[in-house]
Regions:
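C-terminal structural segments of small proteins and small subunits
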Residues: 56-89
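Intrinsic-disorder/low-complexity, polar/charged segments enriched in Ser/Thr/Lys/Arg/Asp/Glu/Gln
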Residues: 1-5, 60
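Compact, glycine-rich, soluble single-domain proteins
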Residues: 7, 11-58
Length: 89
């Protein structure tokens, strides 16, 4: 299992479009990917759960990945978050 803190860096936080990109990324992998914010944990492969986290810019989220391709899955999620979900602002 890989567990690490990541900081949401994009201006609008984990809004619908960013959540959809995260779901698309998570679904490429077999591993279980979960995000935790403020004592609430959700499956990264479900958009509604991600949106309900309410993670805003500069909020810290915990990412937990477990499974056969956990290293690749974590790196993909980390890159997406660090690249501000490919948003311009």
């Amino acid at each position: 299992m890989i567990q690490k803190h990541l900081t949401i860096q994009n201006k609008l936080g984990l809004h619908t479009r960013a959540a959809a990109k995260l779901v698309d990324t998570a679904k490429k992998f077999q591993s279980k990917i979960e995000l935790t914010h403020r004592d609430r944990t959700v499956d990264a492969k479900g958009i509604m759960g991600l949106i309900t986290l309410g993670a805003q810019k500069d909020n810290v989220i915990d990412v937990m990945v477990s499974g056969e391709d956990e290293a690749e899955a974590f790196l993909a999620v980390e890159k997406l978050v660090n690249d501000k979900f490919h948003e311009k602002e």
